[in-house]
């Protein structure tokens, strides 16, 4: 990503969206820049898929407006420059993988060769298989292929690696990163923190219908005034949750990960609780820690304002 300002590709301006009496977004402002991967994070129901739906024209805002390349999302000039991979999406069951990609690519003036798309999506070996005979992860790869086949300037990916094995996830990350480096704006809605950290130039955290944090991954993690301590101990997690400054305790294999705002007192108390403790590691807060902390703080603010 360039250090200079990049052109704004897409924007939500004062967007409000409700489902019945439940307002998911309210006065929501959001913009995507060329050459940048923006990860949209938040708890379940925060509105990540709604943002993706509004940007792609699958949903209409109740208030406010959506602009893609200066147009409404329904405008042909906007749709021709966009690639979409949403959570829900069917495939033409009777077509082979290659036929489905070739058919979809035909709608775009800047289509990539079908063989290139299949290679980038990890589908070369499945080119001749019918779409109704694909596994869930294989079908998601085809949906990714359909999203990239038209050389999009805006790529919207909603939970793209669901059903992928680790190697397939990393391969997709490489392709997405290359698209952004070539100038595309990428919106990544995901609940995988490692995916966000691996890909994102910018992270936007949403909760309660609004943006509660926006910045590079390092800046988002720095918002947590806490330290992570990994301990190898025979004691149960419950023994550590009551210690001063402890925000969160979770079990990771044979270890406990303790997130604390008071690392020295926490370590001293840990040694007092378990004199046999010899293995520990002190690190900064993770992106997952930061997300949990930001969302929790937002809930507290909303309760106090009610």
Q: Where on the chain are the PLM-derived regions?
A:
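Conserved structural motif at the start of ABC-family nucleotide-binding domains
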Residues: 10, 25-27
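C-terminal coupling/interaction segments
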Residues: 2-4, 261-306
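Catalytic Walker B motif of ABC-type/P-loop ATPase nucleotide-binding domains
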Residues: 155-159
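The feature captures the beta-strand-to-loop junction immediately N-terminal to the Walker
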Residues: 41-43
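ABC transporter nucleotide-binding domain
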Residues: 173-261
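Conserved ABC ATPase "signature" region
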Residues: 102, 106, 112-127
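Conserved ABC transporter NBD signature motif
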Residues: 56, 64-74, 78
């Amino acid at each position: 990503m360039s250090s200079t300002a990049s052109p704004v590709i897409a924007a939500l301006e004062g967007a409000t969206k409700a489902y019945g009496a439940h307002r998911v977004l309210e006065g929501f402002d959001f913009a995507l820049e060329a050459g940048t991967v923006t990860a949209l994070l938040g708890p379940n129901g925060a509105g990540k898929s709604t943002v993706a739906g509004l940007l792609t024209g699958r949903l209409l805002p109740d208030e406010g407006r959506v602009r893609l390349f200066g147009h409404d999302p329904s405008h042909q000039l906007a749709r021709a420059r966009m690639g979409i991979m949403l959570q829900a999406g069917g495939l033409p069951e009777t077509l082979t993988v290659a036929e489905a990609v070739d058919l979809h690519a035909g709608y775009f003036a800047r289509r990539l060769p079908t063989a290139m798309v299949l290679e980038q999506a990890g589908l070369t070996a499945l080119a001749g298989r019918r779409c109704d005979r694909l596994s869930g992860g294989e079908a998601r790869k085809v949906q990714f292929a359909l999203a990239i086949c038209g050389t999009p300037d805006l790529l919207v990916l909603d939970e793209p690696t669901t059903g992928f094995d680790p190697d397939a996830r990393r391969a997709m990350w490489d392709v997405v990163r290359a698209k952004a480096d070539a100038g595309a704006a990428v919106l990544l809605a995901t609940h995988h923190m490692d995916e966000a950290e691996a890909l994102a130039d910018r992270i936007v955290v949403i909760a309660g219908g609004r943006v509660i944090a926006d910045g590079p991954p390092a800046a988002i993690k720095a918002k947590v005034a806490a330290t992570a301590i990994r301990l190898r101990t025979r004691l149960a997690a419950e023994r550590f949750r009551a210690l001063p400054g402890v925000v969160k305790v979770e079990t990771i294999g044979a270890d406990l990960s303790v997130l604390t705002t008071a690392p020295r007192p926490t370590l001293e108390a840990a040694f007092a609780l378990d004199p046999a403790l010899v293995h520990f590691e002190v690190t900064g807060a993770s992106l997952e820690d930061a997300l949990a902390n930001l969302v929790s703080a937002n809930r507290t603010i909303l309760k106090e304002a009610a």
